[in-house]
């Protein structure tokens, strides 16, 4: 019995220790912000929320949260928000596409297609 207990304890010591999630946590008037922080144990998501005052002006807020619900900005409403969620190390660092960027995609594709 003690032999089995010893094997169990040795195997248990070999398991990786769970580490707290790290996210960028900040609030910024502009495109993006980066400030890494270790999240509390109860926080299992990194969240990025962009509140649009106009299609070109926004406030970015990044945080650690215990639960997260993703939303999409429609590109037209004032004071509307878009929220993205993720669950791995510093996953909320990169920005996501803004309505202005998305509007350029068809023009770039048309230009590329005309060159062929």
Swiss-Prot record:
Quote the function comment for this protein. Answer: Acts in different tissues through interaction to nicotinic acetylcholine receptors (nAChRs). The proposed role as modulator of nAChR activity seems to be dependent on the nAChR subtype and stoichiometry, and to involve an effect on nAChR trafficking and its cell surface expression, and on single channel properties of the nAChR inserted in the plasma membrane. Modulates functional properties of nicotinic acetylcholine receptors (nAChRs) to prevent excessive excitation, and hence neurodegeneration.
Subcellular location(s) of the protein:
Cell membrane; Cell projection, Dendrite; Endoplasmic reticulum
Q: Which cysteines are joined by disulfide bonds?
A: 23-46, 26-33, 39-64, 68-85, 86-91
Q: Name one GO cellular component term.
A: endoplasmic reticulum
Q: Source species, please? A: Mus musculus
Quaternary state and interactors: Interacts with nAChRs containing alpha-4:beta-2 (CHRNA4:CHRNB2) and alpha-7 (CHRNA7) subunits. Interacts with CHRNA4 probably in the endoplasmic reticulum prior to nAChR pentameric assembly. Interacts with KCNA2/Potassium voltage-gated channel subfamily A member 2.
Membrane topology, as annotated? Lipid-anchor; GPI-anchor
Q: What is this protein called?
A: Ly-6/neurotoxin-like protein 1
> Which PANTHER family does the UniProt record give?
LY-6_NEUROTOXIN-LIKE PROTEIN 1, UPAR/LY6 DOMAIN-CONTAINING PROTEIN
Does the UniProt entry include the keyword rRNA processing? no
Q: In which tissues is it expressed?
A: Expressed in neurons of multiple regions in the CNS, including the cerebral cortex, thalamus, substantia nigra, cerebellum, amygdala and hippocampus. Also expressed in kidney, heart and thymus, but at lower levels than in the brain. Expressed in the primary visual cortex (V1) and the lateral geniculate nucleus (at protein level).
Lipid anchor positions (GPI-anchor amidated asparagine): 92
Briefly explain the null phenotype.
Mutant mice show no gross abnormalities in size, viability, CNS morphology or longevity, but demonstrate enhanced performance in learning ability and memory and are more responsive to nicotine. Aging mutant mice exhibit a vacuolating neurodegeneration that is exacerbated by nicotine.
Q: Which residues form the propeptide?
A: 93-116
Q: Name one GO biological process term.
A: regulation of neurotransmitter receptor activity
- Signal peptide limits: 1-20
Q: Tell me which CDD domains the record gives.
A: TFP_LU_ECD_LYNX1
Which keywords belong to this entry?
Cell membrane, Cell projection, Disulfide bond, Endoplasmic reticulum, Glycoprotein, GPI-anchor, Lipoprotein, Membrane, Signal
Molecular function in Gene Ontology: acetylcholine receptor binding; acetylcholine receptor inhibitor activity; acetylcholine receptor regulator activity; ion channel inhibitor activity
Record-annotated UPAR/Ly6 domain positions: 21-104
Q: Quick check: keyword Lipoprotein in the entry?
A: yes
Where is it predominantly found?
membrane
* Highest taxon, organism lineage: Eukaryota
Q: Which gene underlies this protein?
A: Lynx1
The UniProt entry, under Pfam families, shows: Toxin_TOLIP
